[in-house]
Amino acid sequence: MRLLIEQPRTMSSGSSNFLLVPIPEYPVLDCVPNKNVKIVVLGASNVGKTALIVRFLTKRFIGDYEANTGALYSRKINLDGEQVSLQVQDTPCVSLQDDADGLYCQEQINRSIYWADGYVLVFSITDLNSYRTIQPLYQHVRRIHPSGNIPVIIVGNKSDLLRARQVSDPEGKALADELGGLYFEASARENHESVQAAFLHLCQEVSRALGGGNGEKRKGGLHLARPKSPNMQELKRRFRQVLSSKVKSATAL
């Protein structure tokens, strides 16, 4: 059984780098000049990628999400005493395939991997198959970024569901050690602190990796624009919609 991800198309003759369809420009008026941290969250279906992002950015947990939206969220954060512009890219799921060769996911995921500076690889501790996607997914990231160290963390989400656990804490740590990152068990539902610790650690790793540069990578001479963001107003709108529907349901009872 292997992960199947659609392989990125290569650039025109004369270059061996991956060519990913240009990402639409995103308004930069609110960005902190020369201090940009770009993170992508990757993993299988139903592991809680969006829930982790929302929990980190808003401290709230929303149980209902539109699946596989692939939205990018942007906000300013304080990191080691400095204000930086953080962009967190949500992604559709990757999946295990029994009878296919290679790795499958939408081209959007390949673009996001190419664009990002740091990587959150997420599985659910209640889903062994989601855990098994992490190593081949990391290997795919390395194929897109073959040189140098890449900041990466492994997050075992849904740590509140201990009775349904299929992946032990030592197994998560062993995998993270093998891939050269840190392992965090987290609960998007019940523990904001665990989620915050994971994301802030990665932000610090990315900031150090950028080494005081301008935060904009040049890959093979190709400058990648920022993805379009629904911004925090859109995130708040979704939260109000979910809250309103729950209030109406309670009133109807």
UniProtKB/Swiss-Prot annotation:
Localization, UniProt: Nucleus, Nucleolus
Residue numbers binding GTP: 43-50, 90-97, 157-160
Keywords for the protein's UniProt record, in alphabetical order: GTP-binding, Hydrolase, Nucleotide-binding, Nucleus, Transcription, Transcription regulation
Record's GO cellular component terms: nucleolus
Keyword hit for rRNA processing: no
Main location: nucleus
Catalytic activity, as annotated: GTP + H2O = GDP + phosphate + H(+)
Source organism, top-level taxon: Eukaryota
Pfam families in the record: Ras (PF00071)
PANTHER family (alphabetical): RAS-LIKE FAMILY MEMBER 11
Physiological role: Regulator of rDNA transcription.
Name of the protein: Ras-like protein family member 11A-like
